[in-house]
Regions:
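Helix N-cap/coil-helix junction residues
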Residues: 29-30, 99
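Nudix hydrolase/Nudix homology domain
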Residues: 37, 45-48, 53, 73-130
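Recognition helices and adjacent regulatory flanks at domain boundaries
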Residues: 22-23, 30
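Active-site micro-motifs of SAM-dependent methyltransferase domains
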Residues: 26, 62, 92
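Conserved Nudix-box catalytic region and its N-terminal flanking loop in Nudix hydrolases
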Residues: 1-22, 64, 71-76, 80, ...
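A short coil-to-beta-strand element that immediately follows conserved catalytic motifs
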Residues: 31-38
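Active-site-adjacent beta-strand/loop module that shapes the phosphate/pyrophosphate-binding cleft
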Residues: 44-66
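An acidic, carboxylate-rich microenvironment
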Residues: 15-18, 34, 89
Length: 130
């Protein structure tokens, strides 16, 4: 089994939330009304300044292709196969050692913990001050 979070590639000058919104639409065809930060991590602190923000997008709405601003899926985006997987199943796959992507694990376990707390501790989806 392979599972990954959407990993937006920054466009120069684009805010992280704007990038996440654009990538969600381009790669899945969905738009979200509700965005929060699940995690803010450095992959390799001490050796890299690469910062990864993991967002939670909720209240999703399907956007017909005709309304997607002319984006045409190419390369890997055209090959993506989306499916809904219950969160508890994904957690079980990580705990069983079936899944290994570190950033995806951070996101999965963060949303699992947030859901157990009723999503009350989530932060606004804005870039934290550096």
């Amino acid at each position: 089994m392979q599972l990954r979070l959407l990993v937006p590639r920054d466009a120069p000058g684009e805010e992280p939330l704007v990038t996440a919104e654009r990538e969600l639409l381009e790669e899945t065809g969905y738009r979200a009304r509700d965005w929060h930060v699940l995690a803010d991590v450095f992959n390799t602190p001490g050796t890299s300044r690469e910062r990864v923000l993991v967002f939670l997008a909720r209240d999703l709405t399907w956007v017909p292709e005709s309304e997607r601003a002319g984006f045409v899926p190419r390369h890997e985006e055209a090959q993506l196969q989306l499916r809904w997987v219950p969160l508890t199943d994904v957690v079980s796959h990580f705990l069983a050692g079936d899944l290994h992507n570190g950033i995806t694990a951070v996101g999965v376990f963060a949303v699992h913990a947030a859901r157990q707390g009723g999503f009350t501790a989530l932060r606004e989806a804005v870039l934290p001050q550096r």
